[in-house]
């Protein structure tokens, strides 16, 4: 198959979620990407094009196919068999939204192949049904910062663009599976603790809306919902908090369920922080990312190229 045979491509940014106390509701797009190149074929087949996705299921047991099939079936449609080439630099099970990017891409795949004509709101709802919450999926679909609530019959979301920050990520080479990260959380919080946790979350959102990054950074490190319980799973967290804070970061938090740790810093200062953290954490990948304003992009083959 050559580029001339391609029907369309779908490019989706990765994401981070929570930012500390914005648990299961706050998400932000990040400049790591998943790209699907879709070709007509006589059967469903998925081909990995990068090491990150090497070993993914190659047939109809692939997550992308399963989500696309369920999305199309909701409208009584079937999907024509396709060859899907999968390129990605979003590491799996690291808290950078790899599954949400795949789910968002799958919803768009169904939308294109079955001509569903889904609205943005419908895409968000179907992706959130698969994910269980809208933070990562919303960020991948729409870019920028998103704050949302997902319920079985409806998904609400507010989004904001122009997030003028550098985001430095420290990515350990071990995985933290979402199930394991959920298992360490308490079944409940006491009423006073829940009130305090909610207040911290409210202040995080207020800071985000005002783009008061110093306030945001302080609230990121005051979370009471999940980070106190997950520290044992990510021993680097406390050390990165200290090192990043000593080098100008506004604040540091787990990215999603971890193990990736992210730090916010003033635009233009991220590379210096990246270099500093890379020297301190040689056993991790360290990168300086940005927050793209654009979410999912579909590029269709031009009629003129036929």
Curated annotation (Swiss-Prot):
Main location: cytoplasm
Catalysis performed (reactions): L-homoserine + ATP = O-phospho-L-homoserine + ADP + H(+)
SUPFAM superfamilies: GHMP Kinase, C-terminal domain, Ribosomal protein S5 domain 2-like
Keyword ATP-binding among record annotations: yes
Enzyme class: transferase
Enzyme Commission numbers on file: 2.7.1.39
One BP annotation, GO: threonine biosynthetic process
Any matching Pfam family: GHMP_kinases_N
Transmembrane regions: none
Name of the featured protein: Homoserine kinase
Lineage: Bacteria, Bacillati, Bacillota, Bacilli, Bacillales
Gene of this entry: thrB
